[in-house]
């Protein structure tokens, strides 16, 4: 059973998501407690492969209030856990022009914190405008159909 803690809705607005992957996260005790309370922000975070390891940057986890001296640094880089084969496949794909790894959601699967990564390509401004126009048109059609019945 999955319990979703945080979603990165802005990623769907800023990027075309091509593929999705699941990875575990190496966390400290106070980070897990803080995540369980929902005190996490994925907005500006991204993942990068360095020395054959997958790392997550800029994910903000607020310090745990009862953590005192055992607390963690809120924006420290966190190691993501995936099979070496999967990491190498991702490494090849992220070397392509314009592709990046963006976290889409953070959730607990059983007792383990997992993150869903998206292989993404950045949207241009006109793509965003086009998408908004389509959404508005669909909303207008829906409104017209509702008014008719």
UniProtKB/Swiss-Prot annotation:
Sorted UniProt keywords: Cytoplasm, RNA-binding
Domain of life from the UniProt record: Bacteria
Recorded GO MF terms: RNA binding
RNA-binding keyword on record: yes
Pfam family, one: SmpB
Family per record: Belongs to the SmpB family.
HAMAP family the record matches: SmpB (MF_00023)
Function: Required for rescue of stalled ribosomes mediated by trans-translation. Binds to transfer-messenger RNA (tmRNA), required for stable association of tmRNA with ribosomes. tmRNA and SmpB together mimic tRNA shape, replacing the anticodon stem-loop with SmpB. tmRNA is encoded by the ssrA gene; the 2 termini fold to resemble tRNA(Ala) and it encodes a 'tag peptide', a short internal open reading frame. During trans-translation Ala-aminoacylated tmRNA acts like a tRNA, entering the A-site of stalled ribosomes, displacing the stalled mRNA.
Protein name as it appears in the record: SsrA-binding protein
UniProt source species: Carboxydothermus hydrogenoformans (strain ATCC BAA-161 / DSM 6008 / Z-2901)
Taxonomic lineage from the root: Bacteria, Bacillati, Bacillota, Clostridia, Thermoanaerobacterales
